């Protein structure tokens, strides 16, 4: 099943106060295959002029269709993420969601578009996610995907009906619980995510994140030395699903 990146899909990204991460992520997004076919909405907290400048510069690239929305006041990660998704689904049927520290590989958008098409009618699937902590001996599974009863918020995509099933239980206060924990533990209701065995997203958020105690912890638990950008190989246009037992990298075994 070939992808068709011109269906009713957009990219949304939440930005806050980490300009270096924002720059790395947007530079990578600008290099993605098919980025010209997806509108990109950048939702900025109103606290870092440098982040807003980096986002605005991205919108000037001739091959992207992007715009910046700056909040009137700081609302926190939970509300900003809700606003990004709500905006996306107010205008589109399918949304690809990113954060300032989720660096996409070159074929991430094509992968997400493929997954959104492949699993649209499969109500056992809640989301498609580009992140995976790929073991070195699994890098050869370049076009394989697995499903797991989990939710990962780093470079993910979903559909309007799935969004409508979780939006009413969205947490507003960052001090209580993170939005992704609510989805994973409560509102996805057993539905799974689909992930590539060879990661298409790199998490670079070692500093300044809400739930990362430091660079050493991030390096041990989130950073993936083996992903599509460090493992050269042929272009993938079609992925296929394999049994979850094929990988040692199920999130249930490595939940951080």
Tell what function each PLM region has.
Residues 1-98, 102-256:
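Peripheral/terminal regions associated with large enzymatic or DNA-binding modules
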């Amino acid at each position: 099943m070939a992808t068709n990146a011109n269906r009713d899909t957009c990219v949304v990204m939440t930005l806050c106060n980490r300009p270096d991460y924002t720059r790395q992520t947007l530079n990578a997004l600008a290099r993605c295959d098919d980025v010209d076919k997806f509108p990109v909405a950048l939702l900025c907290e109103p606290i870092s002029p440098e982040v807003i400048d980096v986002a605005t510069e991205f919108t000037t690239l001739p091959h992207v269709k992007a715009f910046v929305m700056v909040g009137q006041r700081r609302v926190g990660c939970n509300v900003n993420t809700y606003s990004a998704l709500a905006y996306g689904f107010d205008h589109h049927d399918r949304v690809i969601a990113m954060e300032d520290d989720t660096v996409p590989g070159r074929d991430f958008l094509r992968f997400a578009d493929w997954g959104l098409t492949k699993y649209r009618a499969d109500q056992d699937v809640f989301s498609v996610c580009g992140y995976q902590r790929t073991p070195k001996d699994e890098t050869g599974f370049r076009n394989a995907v697995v499903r797991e009863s989990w939710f990962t918020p780093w470079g993910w995509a979903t559909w309007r009906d799935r969004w409508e099933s979780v939006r009413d239980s969205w947490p507003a206060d960052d001090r209580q619980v993170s939005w992704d924990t609510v989805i994973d533990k409560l509102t996805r209701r057993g539905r799974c995510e689909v992930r590539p065995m060879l990661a298409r997203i790199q998490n670079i958020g070692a500093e300044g994140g809400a739930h990362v105690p430091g660079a050493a912890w991030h390096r041990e638990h989130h950073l993936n030395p083996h992903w599509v950008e460090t493992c050269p190989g042929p272009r993938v246009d079609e992925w296929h699903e394999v049994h979850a037992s094929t990988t040692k990298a199920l999130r249930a075994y490595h939940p951080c």
